[in-house]
From Swiss-Prot:
Modification N5-methylglutamine, positions: Q150
Gene Ontology cellular component annotations, sorted alphabetically: cytosolic large ribosomal subunit
The keyword ATP-binding is annotated on this UniProt entry: no
PTM statement from Swiss-Prot or TrEMBL: Methylated by PrmB.
Organism phylogeny: Bacteria, Pseudomonadati, Pseudomonadota, Gammaproteobacteria, Enterobacterales
Gene behind the chain: rplC
Name of the protein described by the UniProt record: Large ribosomal subunit protein uL3
Highest taxon above the source species: Bacteria
Amino acid sequence: MQGLIGRKIGMTRTFNSDGSSIPVTVIKISDNKIVQIKKIEKDGYSSIQVTTGVKKFSRENKSIIGHFKKNKVELGRGLWEFKVDKNSKFYVGQVLSINTFININKVNITGISKGKGFSGTMKRWNFHGQDASHGNSLSHRAPGSIGQNQTPGKVFKGKKMSGHLGYNKNTVKNLFVVKIDLEHELLLIKGSVPGSKGSDLIIKPVVKYFSDKVL
């Protein structure tokens, strides 16, 4: 299923005909270029490898630069793959534009969520914390017991504890496409999407429709 790579610009709002406001995320979709076409005969599966944007040669390693030069494609800021039908008619160097999403009502968007650093259990897992008074000393935000005694003599895997929060690859499905601005290459999506401003997003047309509700 072919998709496109976009860059998150930020959030704003637009208005319906009845005057109600809709929160939207603005995504900039610059031209995506096909760097490589993988075929079942050689690679074991059928897909296209795409890039977007531009990048200085001094900021990339030689193996990636060689990969782009071999296929005579301008160096982009990353590489992404999309599985496609083996009979699809694509070619190296082909430009995939925002026109791909014309007549598409819903999309799935994948991105890297905002990193929150090392977080405690109250922020990370929504623990309610311990008593504010009644003998509590310096343990107001502590997680409490993390196990039993000699039996089982260990902390079970998956125990909710403090640790790194955020910066995960997340996919939000069935998001409405509110508007497509072909002139400025902008895609307006209803609601929020993973990632901070300036982060790259993978945008794909939906396969499963969970609702026929429209704006």
